[in-house]
Regions:
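Polytopic alpha-helical membrane proteins, predominantly small-molecule transporters/carriers
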Residues: 1-332
Length: 332
């Protein structure tokens, strides 16, 4: 299987994660406001599973290091498979809440609040279980990210009040998503080998861990998304007849969103061997910065903002960049 051989390459993979995790939400935007997020999500989850299989039979089956994809699945112990799948279930619950928040409050709010909380809590959780890197720089980076979250929330509140359009539900969903999202990565990490080059028996290598994680997402979605269709956060209940009305392009957008997200997840897990779980997860969740850039500059979610709101948005970007820089240096 493919294994990165240097910290520099691992950091590059983490930045790919950041771009992917911060950009997949655009695929939901491209489906249009008439295509509800519950319908988008079926295709999105299929894209996640599809890419995990493709990755396993390509990068997971090439090279001479570690264990091959199929060989690794055959030798995996049940409790490790279960841990990776539980990670998928927790992620799916958190991501449904995040996508709902994004539909209600927009990318520029849902990502900084939801994913920002996930970054701060997730880095702490992963560092406690697997210490790696300079803790002063690591937690200094987390503190800067938390500051960016607070600034973004203040900007959103100020802008919403000026438009007389405050979505408490969007903020609540974002916070709930962030708390859950902080937990999923640890379950996947606990199922994995400590050495990619010389993997322990019974444990999962990155590629099989990603596959079983995706299976957990797929299976749980059959229940979670069905329930959300019956009892939506906003709007009328949906049926599978509504899903069947989607065009090929609309369904393709959803699948593409899942593929883009799982490219990010895969690069993060693969990078963790050299960067450590706390740093690979934390840098990946810098996706918030990318999503906020999309939301502010492409989708114009803060269009018509006052000068004070624009100043807050600028300060949010500065705080995020400072936090990400500290996370990179923490593992150097």
């Amino acid at each position: 299987m493919f294994i990165p051989q240097s910290y520099t390459l691992a950091i590059i993979l983490c930045f790919i994660t950041m771009i992917c995790w911060g950009s997949w939400g655009n695929t939901q935007k491209l489906t249009g406001k008439s295509w509800r997020f519950e319908l988008f999500y079926w295709d999105y989850v299929f894209g996640i599973l599809l890419f995990s299989i493709l990755l396993g039979f390509t990068m997971g089956s090439s090279g001479n290091s570690g264990r091959g994809f199929i060989q690794d699945i055959k030798q995996a112990e049940g409790h490790n498979i279960l841990h990776a799948m539980i990670g998928g279930v927790i992620f799916n619950a958190s991501n449904i809440l995040l996508v709902a928040a994004m539909a209600i409050a927009g990318m520029a709010v849902a990502f900084p609040v939801g994913v920002g909380i996930a970054l701060a809590l997730g880095v702490i959780i992963n560092y406690v279980y697997t210490p790696h890197g300079n803790p002063t720089l690591l937690f200094g980076g987390v503190a800067m990210v938390v500051l960016a979250i607070i600034i973004d929330a203040a900007a959103y509140k100020k802008h919403s009040l000026s438009l007389k359009k405050v979505s408490g539900k969007g903020i609540t969903l974002s916070i709930s998503a962030g708390i859950l999202m902080a937990l999923f990565y640890r379950f996947v990490a606990s199922s994995m080998v400590t050495s990619f080059e010389v993997p322990e028996p019974g444990k999962l290598t990155p590629y099989s861990a990603i596959f079983f994680f995706a299976v957990g997402v797929f299976i749980s979605n059959l229940l979670f998304n069905w329930l959300i269709m019956k009892q939506p956060f906003e709007g009328n209940p949906l049926t599978f007849k509504d899903y069947a009305k989607g065009t090929f392009d609309i369904h393709l957008n959803g699948v593409l969103g899942g593929v883009i997200w799982n490219i990010g997840m895969s690069m993060s897990i693969i990078a963790s061997g050299k960067a450590g779980f706390a740093i690979s997860y934390g840098l990946g969740q810098g996706a918030t910065l990318i999503a906020a850039l999309w939301g502010v500059f492409i989708w114009k979610e803060f269009k018509g903002a006052t000068k004070s709101v624009n100043t807050l948005i600028f300060l949010m970007f500065v705080a995020y960049l400072a936090g990400l820089a500290l996370l990179v240096y923490a593992g150097a």
